[in-house]
Structure formats: structure tokens, C-alpha cells
Amino acid sequence: MFLRRLGGWLPRPWGRKKSTKADLPAPEPRWVDSSPENSGSDWDSAPETMGDVGPLKTKDSGTRRPPGAAPESSRDLKVDQLGSKRMDSLKRDKTASTIQEPARLESGGAIPKLDWDPVDSGGVKNLGVSAQGRLGTIGPEALLEKPGRRQKLLRWLRGEPGAPSHYLQDPEEYLQISTNLTLHLLELLATALLALCSRPLRAILDALGLRGPVGLWLHGLLCFLAALHGLHAVLSLLTAHPLHFACLFGLLQALVLAVSLREPVEDEETADWESEGQEREAKEQREGPGRML
């Protein structure tokens, strides 16, 4: 053991071997901000010098990050800033569109249709105006549905515009239906009374020997008086129960109106069928001699 130690102290002719590893420079002491605001404790209030401190605490985030994460955090911040700018621009566009909508409605202009455009380079979708909203206009006629036959009849009954043409061809003629119905009813009543009293009165006058012009005059006068008393009796009965007879008259008038309103349509259909039949007969007559040849 003594010889080995002695050999280590003796000089060697070839010299000592240099260490292949380069001496690393000593780490410089760094100042660490350990104030109570950042650390949250009073023990870190005094400044400290550390040899190898490592990553420092950032003021924005209380967590420690490695030194290689700095560029990534800067990229994240840029992306967040771009996204916030895009969202602000979208909010401004929405507010502008909401402000412009009532003005467009008042002026009667078409409102463009908003839809989503394809993704842009930033990866955010933008609102755009479709081609249909720019070119096409929505009119009131497109929103209204085509009225049916019942709706047309109701419009005609209410007197609203847009009723079918065949209902309004001759309005005076249709208005005379109710008056003609009353006239026909009174006429039927009077003729029935005259038919009941004419024959008996004529037989009585013949039995009395009243013939010739005097007998005819007396026959007419007596028929008038009999019809007048009969109408008075019938009208007194009708006025005694007006509600019942009014319902019967209304039902009868509704049936007459339904029949009279359908007549023009049926007449047009029959006229069309007759014209088609005549055309077919004419074609057959023309083709007949050609086939014979």
C-alpha cells in the first residue's frame, strides 16, 4: 500500500493524462423573486441565491414550466388572440344585421339568408350570405297557399275579393234568387186558394142562373174575396209562429242557392263535353274517306 501511494507522488516522464470531459462552467447564480405576492408565504420574502434554480415562476401562471415550453405558450397566446378577434368580429356582424333587419322590413326589401361558409384558413367558420338570399326574393304570393273550393265559397259569401269568377258572373241575377223564391211561394199559395174556390163558386153561380158577363164578373169578385181571406188566414198563422216558418224558409232558400250556384259549373262541363264530342265526330268524318282510299 505504501509503494502504491509513493508511485502516485513520483513524476512520470510521459505526463498525466488529461481528462477527456471538458470542465463544465459553474452555473451562475440567479436572482429568484420570492416575494410574498408570488410565493404566498413570508418565508420566501428574503432573496436567495441558488446554484441550479431551474425554471422560474411566471407572474401570469403560478405553475412552473420548463424552459422549452416558452415558444409553445407564445403560440397558444397568439391563437387565443386570433380567436377572440374573430369572435368580436362575428358579434359586430350580428349586431349590425339585427340593426339593419327592421329597416329592411320597413322598406319592403328581401332579407338575405344567412348560412355557414366553408372553413377558412384560420379554422373558424364565418357567416355568409347564400346565393339564394342575394338573388331570390320572397314575395307575399309565395307565402299564401292556394285556397280551396270551400274557402272560395266562404269568401264569396262574406263579400271578400278573390271569389271564383263563375260565382260573380251576374251578381244581380244571383241576388234575385231570394226575392224570386218569396214571390213564387206567395204565387203558389194564391193559385192554390184560387183553385180551391173557383170551381165551387162557378157551380153556385150556375145554379142561381147568373151567366154571361154578369156571372163572369161576379165569379172574379168572389174569387178575389176568397183568396184574400185565405191569404189573411195563412199569414196570420205564419206571424203567430215566425221562428218555425223562418227556419223552414231558410232551409229551402239554402237548397235553392246550392242548386243555383252549381248550375254554371255543370253547364260549363256539359258544354266542354259537347264540344269534345263534336271535335271527335269531325275528326272521324275527316279520317273516314281517307281510310276508304
UniProtKB/Swiss-Prot annotation:
UniProt KW RNA-binding keyword: no
Origin organism lineage: Eukaryota, Metazoa, Chordata, Craniata, Vertebrata
Organism in which the protein naturally occurs: Mus musculus
InterPro entries hit by this protein: DUF4661
Gene: D17h6s53e
Region (Disordered): 1-114, 268-293
Modified residues (Phosphoserine): S34, S35, S89
Keywords in alphabetical order: Phosphoprotein
Pfam hit, one: DUF4661
Name of the protein this chain belongs to: Uncharacterized protein C6orf47 homolog
